Design a protein with these regions (language model features):
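Short tryptophan-centered beta-strand motifs in secreted/extracellular beta-sheet-rich domains
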Residues: 43, 109-111, 172-187
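Short, aromatic/His-centered strand-loop micro-motif at the edge of beta-sheets
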Residues: 154-175
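Secretory/extracellular carbohydrate-interaction modules
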Residues: 48, 84-149
């Protein structure tokens, strides 16, 4: 297995060229399917046992490096999934898989995720406006806590802005969506809008990322990204 671990963060240097990224996926290396104005990352083109193409990897907080790898999954839409497989139990450890072809301020992201294992946490989420491993907005769901929460992370400090108690079953696929439009952030879980929150702490453009926590082994598929005006 040659899934890449956390490394340098070249995406930080390129955030200043966000205006060029308005074309976002036009030059993406990994093919993407267009669905109703959104770009769906083509999981079927990825190689099992390798790190997912077009992602860089980082970590907020402490603990060991993350491990992101493409795995077979018969229950995934394309029979493949992106998995964070490291089981480091450090509580303040938040692995990120940052999608490089996209830089945007206003964006709508939808994913499916499946909590597979974890004794400290079984969490999966979406980060937007990522300008560094320590600065972004986040929605995450946790199967051990049965809740979905929205956070802002500024200079590595995580602050909860909204929460909802809902059933998040382990071993099952769930849909999760985050719409960031100016200072308004709307969270959708399994087709239901849970909360809508206003915040202005991070007003500029940034990357989109997949997120996990601590020892969560979590799988992701059906990742779609739509740039908003």
């Amino acid at each position: 297995m040659d899934g890449r671990q956390d490394g340098p963060f070249p995406f930080i240097r390129s955030i200043g060229t966000a205006c060029l990224a308005a074309c976002m996926l036009a030059g993406a290396k990994t093919p993407a399917h267009t669905q109703a104005g959104a770009k769906m990352i083509a999981m079927e083109t990825m190689k099992v046992g390798s790190a997912p193409a077009d992602f860089d990897f980082a970590r907020t907080g402490q603990g060991g490096a993350s491990q992101w790898v493409v795995v077979d999954d018969a229950t995934a839409a394309s029979k493949l999934a992106i998995e964070q497989s490291s089981t480091d139990r450090t509580d303040n450890r938040f692995p990120l898989a940052i999608y490089q072809p996209v830089t945007a301020k206003n964006v709508e992201v939808a994913i499916r995720f499946k909590p597979v294992a974890g004794k400290v946490d079984q969490a999966g989420g979406i980060a937007v406006r990522v300008t560094s491993p320590n600065d972004y907005y986040l929605v995450r769901a946790n199967a051990l806590e049965d809740n979905v929460r929205f956070y802002r992370i500024v200079k590595g400090r995580r602050e909860q802005l909204a929460t909802a108690n809902v059933k998040v079953a382990s071993g099952e696929w769930h849909s999760l969506g985050l719409k960031a439009e100016n200072d308004r952030f709307t969270v959708v879980f399994n087709g239901k809008t849970l909360h809508s929150t206003s915040d202005r702490a991070l007003p500029g453009p940034g990357r989109v990322a997949l997120w996990t926590k601590s020892d969560s082994v979590t799988r992701f598929d059906q990742i779609s990204i739509r740039i908003l005006p």
